[in-house]
């Protein structure tokens, strides 16, 4: 009892007409509301159990084969696919039977002996429901799912047991307005629309958003008839909580309205972290891997700091090895004479370049202006002699080309 008293308390929302002396105003928060939220388990279990409501379907065994088609064989310059016999119609001569043919059967026709149902471990299903129940107590997850809970006084929302005595839908609407949950029911009502696609022809014409889920604790309660005609509002007995209702589509955070009797039964149905469940044999609530989310506080605690090794301030790091053939400073550390050797090689190279230039300059003689004019005159006289001695002067076509006319 001491551990239970230390747990948070949830306020019970009273309704009009309730006697203040009839019931206590608070109830202890059950451990199932603080269980770890596991969306991975919820998504997997929801995907598996949602398959169990499927109806087997298959195409007809005769589909695509209701004709006496035969292949024409080879020699007609057409494919060997079976062809419809006869004449006088477009159908005659058309290919049949194959999955590539118009009017043919499908590839691998579906059979009704497919494995439609999926088996899920009992403990995994229980963990999924516990996670979904815990998510209903987190306002952020409920709002992220799209529920209108701005006017709701507290999460989880618990109402008095007088709500289970409500018989009329008008009284049920009044109850929802008192606890601030009518906005969500109104949202579900206004979201009714026609389904896109062919589902509208197959008894699935309308779709709508999900409203609040009312969980009651008394078997045969009148609350079922009062709330069942409200669009989007669903009801469920606390002992028959279903993941398809607690997390529709595999998405956590359904807006749940609990009655007091249903909320008090959660402890006995799902147990606690120390005590197993009374209704589910051997089931104990899963514990969170990390109870305290403040990681800095955990690391800096005396218990952990007392066994943690001190910081190594003189850590020896790997030395970066540099290539001495490319890095001069590293080469000088290895061979101090390398600097002198490099300088001597540079000076020797400069000396070789200088000697080469001097040698070339010495070979090149400087010509005076008079010598240049004499060389030019000698060239002209040689050219005239060459023209006069040429046989081409006898032809008129070449005289101008040889310059003889000049």
Curated annotation (Swiss-Prot):
GO terms for cellular component: cytosol; cytosolic large ribosomal subunit; cytosolic ribosome; nucleolus; plant-type cell wall; plasmodesma; vacuole. It holds the Pfam family Ribos_L4_asso_C. Gene3D superfamilies: 3.40.1370.10. GO terms for biological process: translation. GO terms for molecular function: mRNA binding; structural constituent of ribosome. InterPro entries: Ribos_uL4_C_dom (IPR025755), Ribosomal_uL4 (IPR002136), Ribosomal_uL4_dom_sf (IPR023574), Ribosomal_uL4_euk/arc_CS (IPR013000), Ribosomal_uL4_euk/arch (IPR045240). It comes from the Eukaryota. Keywords: Ribonucleoprotein, Ribosomal protein. Residues 56-95 are annotated as: Disordered. Belongs to the universal ribosomal protein uL4 family. This is Large ribosomal subunit protein uL4z. It comes from Arabidopsis thaliana. The gene is RPL4A.
């Amino acid at each position: 009892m001491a551990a239970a008293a230390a747990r948070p308390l949830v306020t019970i929302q009273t309704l009009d007409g309730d006697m203040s002396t009839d019931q206590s105003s608070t109830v202890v928060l059950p451990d199932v509301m603080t269980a770890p939220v596991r969306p991975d388990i919820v998504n997997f279990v929801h995907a598996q159990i949602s398959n169990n409501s499927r109806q087997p379907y298959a195409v007809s065994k005769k589909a695509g084969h209701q004709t006496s088609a035969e292949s024409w064989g080879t020699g007609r310059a057409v494919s060997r696919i079976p062809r419809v016999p006869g004449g006088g119609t477009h159908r005659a001569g058309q290919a049949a039977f194959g999955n590539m043919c118009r009017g043919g059967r499908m590839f691998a026709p579906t059979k009704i002996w497919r494995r439609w149902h999926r088996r899920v471990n009992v403990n995994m299903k229980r963990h999924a429901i516990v996670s979904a129940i815990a998510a209903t107590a987190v306002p952020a997850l409920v709002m992220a799912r799209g529920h209108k809970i701005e006017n709701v006084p507290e999460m989880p929302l618990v109402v008095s047991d007088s709500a289970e005595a409500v018989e009329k839908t008008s009284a049920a609407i009044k109850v929802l307005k008192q606890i601030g949950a009518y906005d969500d029911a109104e949202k579900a009502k206004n979201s009714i629309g026609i389904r896109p696609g062919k589902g509208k022809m197959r008894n699935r014409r309308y779709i709508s958003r999900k409203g609040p889920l009312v969980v009651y604790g008394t078997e045969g309660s009148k609350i079922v008839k009062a709330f069942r005609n409200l669009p989007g509002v669903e009801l469920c007995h606390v002992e028959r909580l279903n993941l398809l209702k607690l997390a529709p589509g595999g998405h956590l955070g359904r807006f749940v309205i609990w009655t007091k009797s249903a909320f008090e039964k959660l402890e006995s149905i799902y147990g606690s972290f120390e005590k197993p469940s009374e209704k589910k044999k051997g089931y104990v609530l899963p514990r969170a891997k990390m109870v305290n989310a403040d990681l800095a506080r955990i690391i800096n605690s005396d218990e952990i700091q007392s066994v943690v090794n001190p910081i190594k301030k003189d850590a020896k790091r790997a030395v970066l090895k540099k290539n001495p053939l490319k890095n001069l400073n590293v080469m000088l550390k290895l061979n101090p004479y390398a600097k002198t050797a490099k300088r001597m090689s540079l000076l020797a190279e400069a000396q070789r370049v200088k000697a080469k230039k001097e040698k070339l300059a010495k070979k090149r003689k400087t010509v005076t202006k008079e010598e240049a004019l004499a060389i030019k005159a000698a060239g002209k006289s040689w050219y005239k002699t060459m023209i006069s001695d040429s046989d081409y002067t006898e032809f008129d076509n070449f005289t101008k080309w040889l310059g003889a006319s000049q």
